[in-house]
């Protein structure tokens, strides 16, 4: 076991787990080379999500740049996980945090933010986190002393994955052929993707995004208006559109088959990864596909995504799943 002086040091170096049951072909054989899926369990970070990486990096970079001083107020638009990560770090460092988030977020995310001492300003549910971003920008303009870290355009977001997630994947899976993650702020795909492209010949970087007009929590479709400033389409090999029901179905399949209890966005990522795997299998190509489990499902139990039939879940989730 590793010893740390602070919780802020205990992020990253998350496990990479083989999905033997879900992989299209785990072993090499007469039928062709293996097509394996590997899940990077980012729910093992201190607050339970991949967002601990950029949150701590953005705060520390703002401190280094002289933007954050003792007692400062941080403002951030968030659909949940980044806010929770920032709230943890702000609590430990003595900053005040104000989060702007859609009013249709799950009760667990609200309670966690409040428990950490963050103030929540709710934006209209319509438009999801896009509306939260607009609201936060208005607040920042009228409160110039507040520091908006702005995860959608902050290079420290991308850097946290270029310097962390990417090198970890390469160390654990040097034979990696594909990397699949969700499109949200785009920081994970841009940072990890850039690192892997620089170090692995012919690696494929695949984005899972919501089908146009459908919401999947924490993900966004780049064709629906707001495009994060971090987004560079040249990093991507492909974008894979996933419907909300498919995301929920795959989330349940992951826990039933591999025992991994993941958040809803991971279902979308798994759906895309299985599509990539099916293509490799049909082409007779070896594939080692790494996918991101961005968080666990605990913060979404109240949404109804995990109870009853898929039809029940679809009804319960209507109006709740926003990017």
Curated annotation (Swiss-Prot):
Knockout-associated phenotype: Strains lacking this gene are shown to be attenuated in macrophages.
Q: Name one GO cellular component term.
A: protein-containing complex
Induction entry: Up-regulated under oxidative stress conditions.
| Keyword list, A-Z | Amino-acid biosynthesis, Cysteine biosynthesis, Pyridoxal phosphate, Transferase
GO molecular function per UniProt: cysteine synthase activity; O-phosphoserine sulfhydrylase activity; pyridoxal phosphate binding
Reported EC number(s) for this entry are 2.5.1.113
Q: Which residues bind substrate?
A: 220
SUPFAM superfamilies linked:
Tryptophan synthase beta subunit-like PLP-dependent enzymes (SSF53686)
| Pathways per UniProt | Amino-acid biosynthesis; L-cysteine biosynthesis
Instruction: Please name the CDD domains in this protein's record.
Output: CBS_like
Q: How does it assemble?
A: Homodimer.
Free-text domain note: The five C-terminal amino acid residues are inserted into the active site cleft in the closed conformation, protect the aminoacrylate intermediate and are involved in sulfur donor selectivity.
Family note? Belongs to the cysteine synthase/cystathionine beta-synthase family.
Name of this chain's protein:
O-phosphoserine sulfhydrylase
Organism encoding this protein: Mycobacterium tuberculosis (strain ATCC 25618 / H37Rv)
């Amino acid at each position: 076991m590793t010893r740390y002086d602070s919780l802020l040091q205990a992020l990253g170096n998350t496990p990479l787990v083989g999905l033997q049951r879900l992989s299209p072909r785990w072993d090499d054989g007469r039928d062709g080379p293996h097509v394996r899926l590997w899940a990077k369990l980012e729910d093992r970070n201190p607050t339970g999500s991949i967002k601990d990486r950029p949150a701590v990096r953005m705060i520390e970079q703002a401190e280094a740049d002289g933007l954050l001083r003792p007692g400062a107020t941080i403002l951030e638009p968030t659909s949940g996980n980044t806010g929770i990560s920032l709230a943890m770090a702000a609590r430990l460092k003595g900053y005040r945090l104000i989060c702007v988030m859609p009013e249709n977020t799950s009760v667990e995310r609200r309670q966690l933010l409040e428990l950490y001492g963050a103030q929540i300003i709710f934006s209209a549910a319509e438009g999801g986190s896009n509306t939260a971003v607009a609201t936060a920008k208005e607040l920042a303009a009228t409160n110039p002393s507040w520091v908006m870290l702005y995860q959608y355009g902050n290079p420290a977001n991308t850097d946290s994955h270029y310097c962390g997630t990417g090198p970890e994947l390469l160390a654990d899976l040097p034979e990696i052929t594909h990397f699949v993650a969700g499109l949200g702020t785009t920081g994970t795909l841009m940072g990890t993707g850039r690192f892997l492209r620089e170090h692995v010949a012919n690696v494929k970087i695949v984005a899972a995004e919501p089908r146009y007009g459908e919401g999947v929590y924490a993900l966004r479709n780049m064709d629906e208006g707001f495009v994060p400033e971090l987004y560079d389409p040249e990093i991507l090999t492909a974008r894979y559109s996933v419907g909300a029901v498919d995301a929920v179905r795959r989330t349940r399949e992951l826990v039933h088959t591999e025992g991994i209890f993941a958040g809803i966005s991971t279902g979308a990522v798994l759906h895309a990864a299985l599509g990539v795997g099916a293509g490799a299998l049909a082409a007779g190509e070896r594939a080692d596909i790494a996918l991101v489990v961005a968080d666990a499902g605990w913060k979404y139990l109240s949404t109804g995504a995990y109870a009853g039939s898929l039809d029940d879940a679809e009804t319960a989730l209507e109006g709740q799943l926003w990017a």
